[in-house]
Amino acid sequence: MFTKKSHADVKKSTAKLQDSKKDSASRLRHLRMILDNVELEESKCLFETNYSHVYFILYDTFIQAEANLKQKVHKAHREELDGSLWLLEKILCLLPELLARRWQCHSLSRIMAKLLHLGNSPKLRREGVRYFLLWYQTLGENAPGYVHAMYADLIPGLIVPQKGVVGPDTEFSASDFLTHPNMKADGGMASVFHDNAFSHPVQSSEVVALLPPSSSEKSAPPDPRDGLEVLLNSMVHTAACLRWRDNRAQKDHRAFAFLLQRFMDVFLPVFSPNFDVSCSIYNPRLDLPVMRSINKKEEVMASCVVVLINWVSRFTHERLLSHRLDCTLHIEDVDQVRLHGYQQGLIVRDVLYVNRENINFVHEVYRQAFLLNFTSKPQIEAIRTAIAVYRDWMTGETPPPFLLEPNDDPPPPSNAGGTPRSQRLRTPSYVGAIAGSKDQLVVRAGRQNVLQVFVTNAANVFLVNTANLNICFPTRSRSYRSTPLEEQTEICKKVLNVYRTMVMNTEMDTRTWEQLLMVLLQVTSIVLHQNQHTLPSGTNKSATLGGILGSAIFQTLIVTWIRAHTKVPVNVLLWEKFLNVLQSLTHREELIIEWNKTIQTLTRVFSRYTYGINLLDLPLDRVAESRAEKRRRIGSVWQGSGSNSAANGGSAASAAISQNRQRESLAESSSSRSEETSSQVPLPNHPRPHHQHTQSQGGTGHGTRPIPLTPMLSRSYSEGSLASAARSSRIRRRRAATPKPKALQPSQLAENRINPQDLRRAMSLDSLARKGDAEETDSYQEGDNESGAGSRSPSPTASSGIEGGSIKDAQLQIDASLDDANSGSYGSGSNSGSISGRRCIILGGSAEGWHPDSTSIMWKRMLGALGDVNRIPKADLHAQVFMHLLEMTQNLIKIKQNQGISTDNQNTQPMPPLVPPIGIVAPWCYGSLSLDRSFKKGKLWALQLLCSLAIQGAVNMQQLPLFYHALHQLLTGEDRDLIYAILKHLEGPRLLSLLLPGHTLLLLDLVHASAILLTSLEVSRSTPRAEVAALLGSLLCYPSSLLTRSVLQPTPQKFELMECSDLQDHILNIVLRCARREPSAKARCIALSQLGQWLLMRLSQPLPASNSGRANLFQQAVPHHKDVHPKASSVYNPRIKEVLQVLLQALQFKHHTIAIVAVDSLKLCAERGRQLAAIERVPQLIITAICKALEIQSVTKPKDSDKVVLTSLMLCLGEFCMAIPAPIMLTPFNEQGDTLVLQVLRVLLQVASGAPRHERVKLTADDDFDMHIAHDDLQGDGRLPEATYQTSETIQKCITAIKLCAKAVSMHLVTHIGHFPMGIGASRLSSMVEEQDDIGNAAYGGQVETRRDSVELPSVVSAQNMQLFMLNSGLVASFIELPTLKLPGGGITAGLVTADKQVRVLMRDLNGKACWDASILYSEPRNAEEPPKTTPKIQHSQPLDSMATSMVTHTPSPRHTLRHRPAGVLPLAKDMAPDLDQLDDMLAYIGHTSPECVAPTVSQLNAPTASPLSGNQEAQAISVILNQRLLEQEFVTHSTQAPSPALRHASSNSSLQQPDQRSLHSTTASFDSLPTRTEMPFQYCRLLFSHLGLAGWERRSRTHLLQRSEKLMRELRNVDLQKCRETHKMAVIYVAAGQEDKGSILRNTSGSSTYEMFVSALGWEIDLETHNGFLGGLPRQGCGATAPYYATPFLEVVYHVATRMPSDSSEAMLLKTRHLGNDEVHIVWSEHNRDYRRDILPTEFCDVLIVVYPLRNGLFRVTVNRKPEVPWFGPLANESVVSGACLATLIRATAINASRTKRAALPLYQQFYEERNRSLDSVSSRYKESTTFEDFASRIYNPMPLSTLGTLRESNASSSAAPLASALLDHNRASVKGWVQASIDSGPIMGIAPSASAGSTAAMEAATGMSSASPRGPRKLGAPFKSVTKKHSLQHIAVGGGAGAGGDTPPESPTLPQRRFK
């Protein structure tokens, strides 16, 4: 039995304990020793056996200690008291059964009274409370009344009123004493022991304090809070301390339940009079909380309430209990004290949860927490605690029993303690006492009831005004003290966070949702209204709770509202309350901000679920094909498969979906976090004005589920919810008829309509137009249809938001992951049979989440949540609302624009049946325009919105009267800001292209408003000066037939029509003024461009009544030959000259962009040169003004922009000089005889020479022309490129380029003026003849044809009949002597007697290459038999091609005379004869008639002077000459008689003898009387060279030979490849109706008739195979047969027309795509109903996109879209309306200017003449041969000496690899004598062994026969040259011929044909 000590010791001590003789102290000591050595059960047996002894020991020791302490407080005496109290505790714990029967009740009460005396020390009194509670719970209900009274006095300072109601036998009455047997004596009234004189014979001594407090302990007055805390803690500490014999667990619970009940009955009503004992969570009273005030009396006891709250939370807060258990279990060697303490906590909690009353008590305690008033820090912490408890109840893993549903199965017993581990710490009986109770099912209230109670009670934290409390609370930071308002704000944030947790993560039923909504409405209404009215107007927002939390409250309310409607059907009356609350708070900016966020978010959801478009990932934003391909590979968000994918659960698909979700969530909000374990959504600490409701695709528990993101609404699940087109149009008409949009408020509609179908229709989005009629079903109930809808998804975020007390930036997110399985893909489930089961909740179905119907209805409901927005009282908020409405409308427009966009760009998708309701807010806009001036900002936003609707075509016929009326009133009103807003947002000419019915009525209003704007001095970026200029310009060029004369009278009060026939004249005046004085650069440019268009139209259609039929829709501008004069009308608009003057004045602008635009506008008229010439003095005016502008624009230190302006001016000048008829250009215009050509050349010479101007040129602009630009809006966009700094090098480059341009233009004019185009057309200005065409087989009449691109050049290099000269640095000339060409019919020289050879001169310069043929003319045919006359006859030989002209030479007549006139006869021309010497006779006549002229030493003037030679020498010289003459005559005679004539040519030391196989050629009309002569191979070239004056000494410094080599010939070929004109290539693309993808557009092979007419008017068709001009990279075969081509004297344009190119194969499509994609300018003709986009044909180029849209009225809308780096250009600006007469011309000019401007913006770009000049300079610098005059003259006589030729042949014949050029370089310095000297030196040899000329073509090819052909067979000429049969009456010539195959023929060069040499 005894375990700790031996039996002897325990028994001995027991005996001593029972010995009454021993003193009580010894007995107590032995008792303590016994208890220390036995178990508890043994101790209980011991006490029960010896209870009398034990109590005696207690009483005796207590009395002794009391007596000792009264005498003196000593340590020993305190120890005696402690021992006595120890025994008291043991008695109370071990003898509960005895005590329960009131054993020693009176004695114990005396002891307890002494212990509980208020004079005792606090420690002793705390112990006394504990002992009393042990005793009190033992007695229970059996306690007498005075014990209950003692309990009521446990809390000092808390006065408990005695109710006087006591139980039976609770106190002794006087009758009990009197009837007691001991009281009876003699007489029945005498007592044996006591004096019975008194009614109470025993007087109780006065109870005094046992142990007064020490001096160190405070003696402050008692605080009820401390007493209450002691009492509550003691209640816990006394639990489970009594050792009952049986049923201990139940009795422990019952004992504590008794204490708790007594506490609730006695103390609770005292310190918490507002404690509602009737509060019940089982039948909750959900009265909405109201505003309360702070009562100071209540605040006194608030600290006690805080103590109670904290005490209850210790045992109901799951997190704290779990934490205590964990701490207990993790400590090694768990002591019994800790374990007992934990068990006590469990008992307390179990008692609190044991029945409904206690559970209601707990919730009422927490309700009292929410009713605290933030007046102390403990109160604030108590509120935090209450919030945390409820939060943990809702989110904890083990809910308390009252949260369980009554119908659910009971929880397992292990869960009773809160955690499974608590099972180990309990005995089976203990657990069974708790879990086995039948009351467990009774206490279950269900989660919904608790949520409703919490929602209602927690709202009280908002409903107290703490702003006026002057209190500060200490914080952790010493420097900062918080205020009650700040603390209340943090608490409210926590409550809102819990509300949001419920909204997002908690399942709630209809009643809970409605309660939450009502509470939020109540909070919103009271808090925001109360703070608004109780504070002065100037108070800062942060000084009120509503000001701080307004945004968060509104957001929570709105989000809860939307979320509720997708979860449960909500009563429609709540919608009324919601509307009323929001409409009453429209004066708060926070509401407007949150409403905007909600609308924008709902618009995104609306877009996704109704139209299948993600606004954050629009199809149009995915421009690059590679990105789209990458999306398709990864797996697009839009490929979700719905419920089928969810059923399959593929891991790869779910992973892809989750990746896409994360990407999209990050795209919407960078602050969105996603954690699976999150439990709530914190609110933002400081609401950001720009934060958005993020759109998350994931929620807790739905992370891996494939979600249907694009339900394609092929069929409506609500059947009739989406109104049909007819019904929606009726509703739109009804709404448009009233300015105030009542239709936006479904509640108002519900009041006026009875039919439930109409009501449901109004609730749904009536603006959704659906093709066809939707089915109508009658299965809906009216109540269901009245409920709203909406949804928000869980937003998992970190739980630290609530713990930290801050509202973080984690918004309630829009639901994209639906919570149930029946919300699958609509596209796949549309054919399912049970459609009604898939209906959304708002329509009476059961499907939760977003559906097309629910999103549409909720979007529209929230749109109208503010009521009539025009009733918003504050103007700035009114403006803010309309700004947000505009943003929403722009998103709707984006949806519309992105519908039907092909993702693969290979086919065009059909337009979907649903169209976004873009114009849904139009009635509000019309209503806002009628407000007063204070709402001006809102009216501006409304106007912008209306204009956007008009541009998008959303203004229907019913709204047009309202729209026109509003525009008319505002345009003619006085408010300029509104006028400017209309003019800006109508986008100028865009209004005209809309073709709104009756829009011409507003023309006069628009012109009137435009005039007001343009005449004002307001210049800013917001002033639409450019748009107005474009609008007026388009109206200026409008066909008069389309302008109605009836327009609205421009007065604001009237709406009447008037006649205005001179509208365009009025517009012209305004545009002229704009061009003269406009301060904005962009508007000035547009005005000048429009004037140029007007000029073009008036010159193209001189008569106003010109035919406007389709036959004259386009005019093709084909350049005519100079002899062809087209018919021109002689009647022109009289204001043409005035307009021209303005354009010409603008040329002098120092603003370079404006000057270039003026030049471009003027160039438009260059094509109409003949029409301009018909107007008096206009050509002279134009030429003079351009020349003057050149002088003005010329500066000494030009920049790149100056260079661009000057070159544009010079090229424009050249164009006009070529366009104006040559007779006008050559006619003198002043007395000095100056012509326009002379004036032009003078200016160009001045520019080219860089001569400085000695006097300043005065501006020719008149006084009305303003050269100043006040607002340069082209600074950042459209400005010409300029270097940031200038250096001498850059300046010199610009000067060189300007001079070169002037030189090129002047040379061009000299060559081509009056000659363009020639017979061949405009395609070529340069000759196609090359040197190799005349070398080789030219001697055979050109019978063999070779390739032009052949690289066999040695025959040219070594040709004896050709020489290359550099006449100056920019002019290379080739002289070639060749036999006279046989032309059909004799050509131009038919019948004339010419030499048998002719000279061909090829000249290359900046202007191109020219070919001149020169031939000697002997006589006319009629004088063939007579001796030839001495007068030369000029004749032209037929050129090789039509671009070559003939050069004329003449032969000198022989000068040998045999007779003389008499000295006195005057020689006259009429009696001149061949045998008379005119000069000799004249000298004789002068000497005879005027002897004074004869010198004294001279006999006569015609007498020769004395010979300087002696007589012998003179005779010898005469003899030599005569011998030479004789030899020549013999040689001639011998050569004419020889059957095989041969020529002999000898070098200085050797001779080459080769037979001459060339038959001598002579003309058909040769001289028979004269012997046939054989000239030297270069004789005629030498004669021409000499006759041209090139052989003179004075030209020696500029004329040089060129070193002939293969490299030189390739360089010359490279020069020939350089263009002589500016070249452009452009793409022309046709888009048919319904085409919006790359594939279908490129497959078009033809277009409409109007398109074909347009293409034909862009230029003229050329045959690609035979075209000799610019091809723009097009191959001659493979890209179609023809292409449009356009050319002027200075430029060439080729159009890559997509419909001309084949598309029958993938290779052809690839080739077409390459050609089109590489063009920098795209011209698109679109007949599709939507605008063309750049990304349809994706390319890195396409810097400028010009799109033409044909309009219904015969006009054309043109848009010009340029990349940002492209500067501004004209004449067409973006958005223009153009007539067909000038469309092609304007498009062509705009495209050319665009291409030119783009190139000018490129760094290091060079013009065509710069590139050609560089090539010519390369030839001059590399191959110029420096020779002495002797060598130079020798090479003219003999181009290739034999020494050089022999070396060439040896090098060619040898096996060495030395190139030909090295041989030329090595031997060109050989000592070679002239031709004549060589002949004299080798005279004898010449006579003996004549040989053929080594330099002749025959000698070169002696080894081959006449019929030998080139080793390469003849083939068709390749690009870029072709030999074709000319279509005109020229001869067919086959030129060229390869060298023979013999050993003397130079080898082929291995160089490729197209390679360039440097």
UniProtKB/Swiss-Prot annotation:
Residue ranges annotated as compositionally biased, kind Basic and acidic residues, are 758-774
Recorded GO terms, molecular function?
GTPase activator activity
Task: Specify whether Transport is a keyword of the entry.
Answer: no
Which residues lie in Polar residues bias regions?
A: 788-800, 1546-1568
| Residues the record lists as Phosphoserine modifications | 718, 764, 767, 787, 791, 793, 795, 1551, 1949
Per UniProt, the keywords (alphabetical) are: GTPase activation, Phosphoprotein
Q: Where is the composition biased (Pro residues)?
A: 400-414
Biased composition annotated in UniProt, kind: Acidic residues: 775-785
Q: What is this protein called?
A: Probable Rho GTPase-activating protein CG5521
List, as start-end ranges, the regions of compositional bias called Low complexity. 640-656
GO BP annotations, alphabetical order: regulation of small GTPase mediated signal transduction
Provide the residue span(s) of the region labelled Disordered. Answer: 1-21, 400-424, 635-804, 1534-1568, 1903-1958
Pfam families (alphabetical): RALGAPB_N (PF20412), Rap_GAP (PF02145)
